[in-house]
Amino acid sequence: MSDTTTTDESQDEPPADTPEAILRAHLDDHDYQIFEALNEDGRMSDTELSDRVGLSRTAVRRRRENLIESGILDILAVIVLQEADLAYADVRVSVDQSVGRAERDAIIERLVDAELIYSVNSCLGDHDLFVRTWHTTLNDVKAYVWDLLDDPAVDDYKITPVVKTWKAWNRDLDRPTSD
């Protein structure tokens, strides 16, 4: 007869392929609960957090401050571009492979410094950079990207307009509806 009993530890493990399971290497249960609560409401007070997490206000404040100071947690406000009826796009950029590190770094610096770029990522595959940008209209997005990437060190780029976002920043923004 096989032993099918489970220990309490295995019952406490979150399901694989969940944020909680993946973040266990960085956050204990209380820190994860703090993250979840602040992700729902970034303005939640330490008193509300302590009630929700089951720790003292001082302990919650110390943990929140440690998470922020370590760079693991950042509390910020974002504009939900589709709700503001603004245009946004993903841009995949290929850098000329013959250019040196200084030229590549200059492109990245320019993208990071650009106010209408909200994400700059290095990637593997057909392109070197994955960039997200926004503007008033798609025509403005296109002109902005043209100007920004007018550089001999940029080999190629592709602009993909985004027309709908259902989920961002670990939040449902909308759900598909069947008409």
Model-assigned labels for residue ranges:
Residues 1-179:
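A compositional/biophysical signature of low hydrophobicity enriched in polar/charged and small residues
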